[in-house]
Amino acid sequence: MHKLFTYLCSALLLVTATSCEKKTEKLLLGGSGWNKIVIIDKNTKQVEWEHPLEKGWECNSAVATPDGNILFAYARGAKLIDRNHQEIWNIAAPDTCEMQTARVLPDGNYLLGWVGHPAVIMEVSPKGEILSRTEYETGIEHPHAQFRQQNKNARGNYLMPLFATSDVREISPRGEVVKITRLEGTPFTTLALANGNHWVACGDGHSLMEVNLDNGEVARRYGENDIKGARLFFVAGLLPAKDGGLYVCNWQGHDKNAVEANSPQVFEINDKGEVIWNLNDNERFGMISTISTIE
């Protein structure tokens, strides 16, 4: 009986210990100027999967889909691939345009967007079926100076951050301007918050700000040297982290001396703006402008 009791206690302890182990978070990373997209273990910072990109495939949007596939924009189009690198579908952009946006929407469909004349926003099913298409003329002559990551807001409109005009435009599905919010720098992406505000990554403005896009009021702003341990360069992709924190992609391609600053390529801040995790390894990782969690 004593042996049986000891065995049962040991088994219970093993189950308890196993159940208490934290599941390791995985991050999908990519970036303009980097020749691959990768999945890393957040804790070890080791690359566990990588997919090569051809020369000229500028990737500013890469995201994991709910079923574990990888959706990414690569300037010439957008692809959905599986973890075995098999292409599920590919939607090409016209020769004079650049596909820059590839996002997963809350309803499970995807948001794609290319810059050009006009710029085009599409909602696409997981099977690659184009469900809707919105055209909008930005008025910005050079397509590359238009947008990178667009998002869809709770009103069902599209948020288009524009480089050349330093603003975020809310565009209806019919291609009509609903609202223009003037900001600073070269806005790269937006991220909705529970309070109705949005984080806006301001690119070459070397800044990150929380903004009410309805009235333009800035609730918080971090400038180039405001975050201890992370000098801001081109502030790019954003991702919500646990406990109200935020992942920030700190793309360094516009400053030839960026490596000397020893500032992380991507980092996580808590709700107080303190760095609690970072990735700073220019030998193993390229310039990072997009981030996603992945199972």
Regions found by a protein language model. Give the residues of each.
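Histidine-/acidic-rich catalytic cores in large beta-rich domains
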Residues: 23-295
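Bacterial Sec-dependent signal peptides at the C-terminal "C-region" and cleavage site
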Residues: 8, 12-24
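Bacterial N-terminal signal peptides that target proteins for export
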Residues: 1-8
